[in-house]
Amino acid sequence: MQKTSILILALFAIAEAVPTTGPIRVRRQVLGGSLASNPAGGADARLNLSKGIGNPNHNVVGQVFAAGNTQSGPVTTGGTLAYNNAGHGASLTKTHTPGVKDVFQQEAHANLFNNGRHNLDAKVFASQNKLANGFEFQRNGAGLDYSHINGHGASLTHSNFPGIGQQLGLDGRANLWSSPNRATTLDLTGSASKWTSGPFANQKPNFGAGLGLSHHFG
């Protein structure tokens, strides 16, 4: 946890060191959201209200949101406060899922490469989690996020659960179709995760895949 906190502070310092250009302006409130098909049933819906201060390269954005599945499960509500400076930044997120868990997460990220088509970010994170039955645990780690201008992407994440074990995760997304304004997309997704230490280390890797249609508005 201490190492993760140091990394978060280091990345935030990098963000502060990057010079900014352009005037600061107040943005209007933006109501947006998304609706995505879920192979397990129903559709995953999200509604969010955001307001930011700054310009596209240097800003602070606050957001409140609600997300859930149209067929089953409780609705998760929460809020995020994010700071961005030329691709570097940090965020604080608090979520509540009734009858399931409460999570408070801190994250910092730094842009490593961006040529207008390919983007690569490094991130560190820490979270405090409390389940509905009172059990509490922490999660911290680091990862790399890659994205392509055409909607493809991948992420590699290493997570540490103090007192439980460590886990390695890989997620990928291939965009098969997009509407002209990219508001609606058809994506093929895949994921893999494996416990690398702890009592679950002898379990087989967990794989997942899906084909989903998503629409974003706002």
Swiss-Prot record:
Disulfide bonds: none annotated. Residues 1-17 form the signal peptide. The keyword Signal applies. Changing residue 138 to P: In strain: 2CPA-122. It is found in: Secreted. InterPro entries: Attacin_C, Attacin_N. Keywords: Antibiotic, Antimicrobial, Cleavage on pair of basic residues, Immunity, Innate immunity, Secreted, Signal. Hemolymph antibacterial protein. This is Attacin-B. It comes from Drosophila melanogaster (Fruit fly).
